[in-house]
From Swiss-Prot:
Its EC number is 4.2.1.59. Keywords: Cytoplasm, Lipid A biosynthesis, Lipid biosynthesis, Lipid metabolism, Lyase. The keyword Lipid biosynthesis applies. It is an enzyme of class 4 (lyase). It is found in: Cytoplasm. Belongs to the thioester dehydratase family. FabZ subfamily. Involved in unsaturated fatty acids biosynthesis. Catalyzes the dehydration of short chain beta-hydroxyacyl-ACPs and long chain saturated and unsaturated beta-hydroxyacyl-ACPs. GO terms for molecular function: (3R)-hydroxyacyl-[acyl-carrier-protein] dehydratase activity. GO terms for cellular component: cytoplasm; membrane. It catalyses: a (3R)-hydroxyacyl-[ACP] = a (2E)-enoyl-[ACP] + H2O. HAMAP family: FabZ. This is 3-hydroxyacyl-[acyl-carrier-protein] dehydratase FabZ. Pfam families: FabA.
Amino acid sequence: MLDIKKIKEILPHRYPFLLVDRVISVEEGKKVTAIKNVTANEEFFNGHFPEYPVMPGVLIVEALAQTSGIAMMQSEANKGKIGLFAGIDGCRFKRQVVPGDQLLLEAEITRMRGAIAKAKVKATVEGDLVCEAEIMFALSDLPK
């Protein structure tokens, strides 16, 4: 389990773009399960949509990408690197995410060859599928 302090040591993202609140399980270099608590105070709800707040799908995908990043950075070989979003396949949204929902984010690294990595990801709320996709990353060295 990783708290927000540990997550910030792994991911370069910060408020308002850090979309992982807690990691509840880690299978080193392979799989991560994390949580994003969606509150009524999220800035994106001011415009999406004021009278009908729905979490934008692209931010659900970003939360899944960040969860994948945590999985990739658990590998010692990837310390000091950053995963840059390189592509997405088969992305489907099945349910809206609204204030009060808790997103369960799952990412499993399926391929890691050189600087390219792929992950199967899915987000659920209370067991209901919200989103699933396959995400591709290009690993790059962080600037010194």
